[in-house]
Amino acid sequence: MEKIDIFTDGACKGNPGRGGWGALLVMGEREKELFGGEPGTTNNRMELKAVIEALNALTRPCEVIVHTDSQYVQKGISEWIHGWKARGWKTAARAPVKNVDLWQALDAAQARHQIEWRWVRGHNGHVGNERADALANRGVETVNSN
């Protein structure tokens, strides 16, 4: 199974507002950069979108290490999602899970891979995270500001 490091980030100008997501996929000496943007979104949605797009870009099952500066993503996929699914996508307080569409998409995207989820401190000089941040900001720039 191919081993891949994925660095992801989301950005938002206003929350909600124009948002962007970015992902850097590193496979040995090879790299692939992905980014995109959406109007009227949130930082959490863009963080999720970055991981979903990165995993969906993989053409076959892989051993993946996902590096994210989003505790929302890291804890959500590693800890909270099991309870949400058991409760029919409701929180412990029985409220609907926010961003359920993206959580379900991420759950499906991760299913065919072996994934280790790593949280990294954002804006702390971590090269992969800084590159993902720059890609997310490029994603914001693709969205018209009208």
From Swiss-Prot:
PROSITE patterns linked to this entry: RNASE_H_1
- GO MF, one annotated term: magnesium ion binding
Which positions are annotated as binding Mg(2+) 1? D9, E47, D69
Quote the catalytic activity from the record. Endonucleolytic cleavage to 5'-phosphomonoester
What GO terms in the biological process aspect are recorded for it? DNA replication, removal of RNA primer
Q: Where is this protein localized, as stated in its record? A: Cytoplasm
The domain of life is Bacteria
So where does Mg(2+) 2 get bound? D9, D133
List each copy of the RNase H type-1 domain by range: 1-141
Principal cellular location given in the protein's record: cytoplasm
Q: How is the cofactor bound?
A: Binds 1 Mg(2+) ion per subunit. May bind a second metal ion at a regulatory site, or after substrate binding.
Q: What keywords is this UniProt entry annotated with? A: Cytoplasm, Endonuclease, Hydrolase, Magnesium, Metal-binding, Nuclease
Q: Which cofactor does it need?
A: Mg(2+)
How is the quaternary structure described? Monomer.
Q: Which family does it belong to?
A: Belongs to the RNase H family.
Q: What does this protein do?
A: Endonuclease that specifically degrades the RNA of RNA-DNA hybrids.
- For this entry, the protein name equals Ribonuclease H
Native source organism of the sequence: Herminiimonas arsenicoxydans
Question: Organism classification, top ranks?
Answer: Bacteria, Pseudomonadati, Pseudomonadota, Betaproteobacteria, Burkholderiales
